[in-house]
Every structure is written in structure tokens, then in C-alpha cells.
């Protein structure tokens, strides 16, 4: 199986798990941990865990850049990270409630300044698939990088997939503009809200059909409802999500993308690839943090017994 190149972001995740609603103007008890994250880096880490030869192109800051490089290498990823000497790494504060749902406060930091200067054509040597996190595209330097990478991948007949990232920045960027800029991609992997927004549709099936008519293949992530896949305007596969006790939903979609892409690159059927994606996504939500092997990460507070405390 040829390699996977992911272009995306690395983020320092501050994950705060709290049992009840956050109290305004006073303290709310929480278990807080510091972990490596970022949509692109998460997908790359899960893909490496699943056996793919994976490299990541990203930009990190002067403060935690070397830590991010080390964490990616621990995960089996070949990191191609430029350390920005003037900017800190991106930071996300993820507030996770007792159901596993999260709300996020975001500072893009160095990740918002990745650009064509970070690119070299040899990044595509030995690569069988290019995957883009759309977070990279929402700032002009990253958009120029995405255009360049997709153009060079297309010239080498390397298939391209894109994850639309998040409804907020996607809406600000413009859905028609996004569809136009990502036209070289043959696979799009949105969650349900992103799919409905991009397709201007009312249900998952309609959105998948519409998006697959544009890209060729659309994979719509449905969370606990599993996933479905459409090709050329027709639903061709579905998969159910395995049951799991949800601890933290951060990174579930990134893990799904990794499972789906690695299985697809290995020649799996659409049904098998969806199932592998769902399995990876469920593995992600059963733990704290967005990457595999949480025991390898630096913790600010212990999380032993966390599930017991959350569901007490």
C-alpha cells in the first residue's frame, strides 16, 4: 500500500471534562489535560496506528513545536513540521460535558500561517493518497498551499480527499467557494451538519447524493448513527456504529477519516471501509483526547477513573 500524505493542522488541546453546566462568573470543577491535537494531525496519527505509511505537513509554533514533533513521531507519523519562530502553536480549549459533547474555543496560531513556502514536491514521492483538512484552507496562505498540493497531486494521478472541518469557518468561507476550490478532490468526508450545509439538503441521503455528484464519492459521518457513502449520485453503502460508552467526542471524525482512508487504500469494499471508519471513530470517543495511545501524552491532571466520575 502506498503512503498517505495529510496536510492539516497541529493544535495543543486543553481538554476540560466537567460533570454539570459551566457556571458563569465562578468556578466549575473539571478534569483538565493537555494533549496534542489538530484535525490533520489526529487523522495522520490514527492512520499510522492503523498501519499506513503516513506523513503530515503542518506548521507549529515556537512554544510547543518540538513537543508536537515528538508526539507525532511517537504515533508513527513522519512529521514535516515547520516551527514558526514568531508565533505560538494553535490552541483549542475543548469543554466536554458528561455526554461527551464538546464546545471549543480556538486560536489558530502558527497553523493559520502555513503556506506554499512549507511545500516541496518530494512530499508526494511514494504517496498513494492526499488528504486535506479544510482548516488549512480557511486562511489565504493555506488556501494557496492547498491549490498547489492538489494541482501537483492531480498531475501525478494521486487521488485527493478533503474533510470540510467545521460549519462555522466553512460558512464564513462560503460553501460555493469551498466546492469550487476543492473540485480536484474525488472524495469528501463531512459530518452530517457539514454535509447538509454544503449540499443545501434536508437529510443525509440527499446531501450524500448531491455531494457525490460533485466529487464522485461522498462519505457522510453520522456519529452514533454510523455513516453512509454515495457515488456519482447514488447511495451505495452504509455502516452502523458499534456501541460504545462515550467519554470525549473530540477527534472522532478525524479518526473515522483515517479508518476509512486506510481501508480504502488497502482495497476494501465501500462497506468494509465505512465499517473500519466507524470502528476508529468509536475507539476515539471511548477515551479522552483525539489521538490513539493517550498514555503517551503529557497530562496536567490524572484521568484515572474519569468515566466512573462522569457517570457517578
List where the protein language model places each region.
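A short, aliphatic-rich alpha-helical micro-motif
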Residues: 123-125, 182, 212
Amino acid at each position: 500500500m502506498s503512503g498517505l500524505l495529510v496536510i492539516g493542522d497541529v493544535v495543543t488541546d486543553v481538554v476540560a471534562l466537567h460533570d454539570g453546566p459551566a457556571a458563569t462568573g465562578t468556578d466549575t470543577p473539571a478534569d483538565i489535560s493537555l494533549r496534542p491535537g489538530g484535525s490533520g494531525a489526529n487523522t495522520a496519527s490514527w492512520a499510522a496506528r492503523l498501519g499506513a505509511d503516513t506523513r503530515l505537513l503542518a506548521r507549529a509554533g515556537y512554544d510547543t513545536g518540538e513537543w508536537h514533533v515528538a508526539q507525532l513521531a511517537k504515533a508513527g507519523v513522519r512529521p514535516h513540521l515547520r516551527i514558526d519562530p514568531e508565533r505560538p502553536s494553535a490552541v483549542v480549549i475543548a469543554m466536554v460535558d458528561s455526554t461527551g459533547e464538546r464546545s471549543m474555543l480556538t486560536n489558530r496560531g502558527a497553523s493559520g500561517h502555513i503556506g506554499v513556502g512549507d511545500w516541496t514536491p518530494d512530499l508526494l514521492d511514494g504517496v498513494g493518497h492526499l488528504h486535506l483538512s479544510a482548516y488549512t484552507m480557511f486562511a489565504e496562505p493555506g488556501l494557496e498551499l492547498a491549490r498547489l498540493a492538489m494541482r501537483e497531486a492531480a498531475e501525478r494521478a494521486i487521488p485527493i480527499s478533503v474533510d470540510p472541518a467545521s460549519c462555522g469557518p466553512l460558512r464564513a468561507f462560503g460553501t460555493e467557494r469551498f466546492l469550487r476550490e476543492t473540485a480536484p478532490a474525488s472524495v469528501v468526508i463531512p459530518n452530517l451538519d457539514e454535509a447538509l450545509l454544503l449540499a443545501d439538503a434536508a437529510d443525509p441521503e440527499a446531501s450524500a447524493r448531491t455531494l457525490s455528484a460533485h466529487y464522485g464519492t461522498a462519505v457522510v459521518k453520522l456519529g452514533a448513527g454510523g455513516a453512509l457513502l454515495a457515488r456519482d449520485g447514488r447511495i451505495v453503502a452504509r455502516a452502523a456504529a458499534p456501541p460504545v460508552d462515550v467519554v470525549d467526542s473530540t477527534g472522532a471524525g478525524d479518526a473515522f477519516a483515517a479508518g476509512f482512508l486506510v481501508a480504502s487504500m488497502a482495497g476494501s469494499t465501500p462497506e468494509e471501509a465505512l465499517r473500519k471508519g466507524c470502528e476508529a471513530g468509536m475507539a476515539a470517543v471511548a477515551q479522552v483526547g483525539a489521538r490513539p495511545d493517550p498514555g503517551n501524552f503529557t497530562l496536567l491532571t490524572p484521568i484515572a477513573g474519569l468515566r466512573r466520575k462522569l457517570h457517578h
